[in-house]
């Protein structure tokens, strides 16, 4: 079933609440003060049922200028607008402001409702119709149906219901296959149940028992119960008005303007890159550095406007800007927003979010402006490639990319496939992606680093893997760093052996004297067999004048894996170590576990020597220790 939210808009006392009551039978004025004053102060909600069994949620917003902030909180999630204009008064200031807000928020469909038609004669109605047509010309309601009604007499109510039903059928259904997001417009407590939040589910689907994250705080909770239009449900989907009972959350932990979202699906930031537009009929110019009220979803925050390519934004103009906040904001690329002047409060413009967690930009930076142009107007592939490039070596998943771009994964998948096919992106790990340009830059740094290392350490077979990861990557998990380096190994650019990396064309070049020392050292360790020799004793066998040179060659043999370090200054010939591994493999063919005593007997050596070798096997994951026993390690059969 399709789920759509209809929102009222219009000047105070033009009959929005009475119209909703006539349509739905629900009085959305629930506060005593609203009853006493005869005007809507808070958001009201009702369910509108249609003959075919479908239904829509109706959000009734206040029309008084003092409550525009509340109106904005309700307007953020609507699909269809119901612009209400009283026939006896016509367009008024808040009618204009509400229409501007709907346009800025990206609402593209709706109906114009002329109310209180019983209070206007035929001549006045004709004037009202003409004025209405002129006022909506050039807006999204220019060709919208106009329905004349009277809540008092019932005139036009059925026509309006049929018109709304037709619009609902034509409205595109929102996807439930994306992470859910619910801007919170109301918070209260229910005895015996705890904290309940309400809002319009603008994306995805929520499930009872599912995990949810409160933003911008990042507090995690569990969905204890869900209600849609007062009825319990196991699942709620985008386009529905939802009440969510949250487990372990206090009422004081949540405020209107917070967002409830699928964990890790929405980023928080104090910077937003945007396309900012100033209303044509605004009397204000937005200066660089202006302080404004930023209205997004159900939230309102103070922001500083940094215009990126000019000093001022005049009425009717549009430009790229960065909004800077003093508190965290939870938003996504593609979201719409409204800005209101700081003092006096009036709507002056709005726009669309292009980057929801950017870096702090300098003004008049051509590269920044070019990147924003791609984000706004580029093809799907261009936007994906730009996002991958910006994410550097983070290796995002498709879901993370989709969330960053405000794009559904089903739309993202073919764009990613095309980039992979053209060689503009790569997948170092299954389901993890990187831009090829980032890989090229990474290789340039890696090559320069290793070239320098080889020059300074000509007798070392390579740099330790851990050291290379530390020097080459920042805040990248070892598994992902190794996957990127493995790409270079696969491409024949790097060589990896004995936990060390080297340039593929690098070889250790010994002098004649060093070659002789190497031969002698290897012969000594080979003769020692399973009796690990201390390096100081080995070095004592050589002429004192060759001591420094011998130490360098010894270090080279260790880095090259020709000698295996069992402990500080205790080494074993690699052939002996390989032989020990083979004996262990053969032993495990007939036994489940290995003891130190059995290993000693297997090698035919002393207990101390056997223990040193066995601990080395543990470190290299050839064996796995469980108390006093050993079992086959992950790398035993490599």
PLM features: what roles do these ranges have?
Residues 120-124, 131-134, 249-565, 573-622, ...:
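C-terminal effector modules of nucleic-acid-centric enzymes and ribosome-associated factors
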Residues 12, 39-41, 47-52, 73-77, ...:
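Conserved catalytic network of the ASCE P-loop NTPase/AAA+ motor domain
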Residues 64-65, 88-92, 107, 116-121, ...:
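Conserved nucleotide-binding/hydrolysis micro-motifs of P-loop NTPases
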Residues 13, 19, 38, 60, ...:
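Residue-level signature of catalytic and energy-coupling elements of molecular machines
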Residues 1-61, 65:
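Conserved G1/Walker A P-loop phosphate-binding module
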Residues 11, 187, 204, 226, ...:
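Residue-level recognition of beta-strand microenvironments
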Residues 117, 134-282:
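Conserved catalytic-core segments of large NTP-driven translation/proteostasis enzymes
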Residues 55, 61-66, 76-127:
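Conserved Switch II/interswitch segment of TRAFAC-class P-loop GTPases
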